């Protein structure tokens, strides 16, 4: 692991964009796991700008939505789905066959997790994951706790 220390949010966003574009340059068909929230927003904007200059770089990669709030409609503006479609998937015009997304209101949340796991089992591992750390230390929907849970889970 390499730790990068950046002096500002803009510098962090630029560095993250450089890492993602470098990885895409080496492996265009990679799977990128995308988080939502304040941390990655500027990086997504920079990637969209880069895609206007180098569209071929973004022509094969797959986006996996990291997580989703349960029990609300997918078109609700507060979903991770809405965020990713507004800031990343939509502006990059990622086709549905290269966008893997949890449903926000499945009848069976465990079956939905299994559906995503089966897709990943077929496709292969995640190549790069974009994560931020929330103000209280949370990562994704994993709130601070005495231990980490390594298996997939549904949070309601």
Residue ranges and their predicted role:
Residues 17-25, 48, 52, 85-89, ...:
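Generic structural signal for well-ordered alpha-helical scaffold segments
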Residues 43-49, 139-150:
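Short Gly/Thr/Asp-enriched flexible loops that form oxyanion-binding sites at enzyme active sites
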Residues 153-156:
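Conserved small/polar residues in nucleotide/adenosyl-binding loops
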């Amino acid at each position: 692991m390499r730790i990068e220390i950046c002096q500002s949010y803009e510098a962090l966003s630029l560095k993250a964009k450089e890492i993602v574009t470098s990885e895409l340059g080496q492996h265009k068909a990679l799977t990128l796991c995308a988080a939502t929230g304040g941390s990655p927003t500027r990086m997504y904007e920079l990637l969209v700008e880069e895609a206007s200059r180098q569209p071929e770089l973004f022509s094969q990669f797959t986006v996996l939505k990291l997580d989703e709030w349960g029990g609300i409609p997918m078109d609700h503006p507060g979903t991770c789905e809405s965020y990713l479609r507004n800031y990343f998937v939509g502006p990059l015009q990622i086709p549905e066959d290269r966008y893997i997304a949890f449903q926000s209101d499945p009848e069976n949340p465990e079956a939905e997790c299994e559906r995503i796991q089966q897709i990943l089992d077929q496709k292969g591992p995640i190549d790069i994951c974009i994560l931020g750390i929330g103000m209280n230390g949370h990562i994704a929907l994993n709130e601070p706790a005495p231990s980490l849970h390594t298996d997939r889970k549904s949070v309601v």
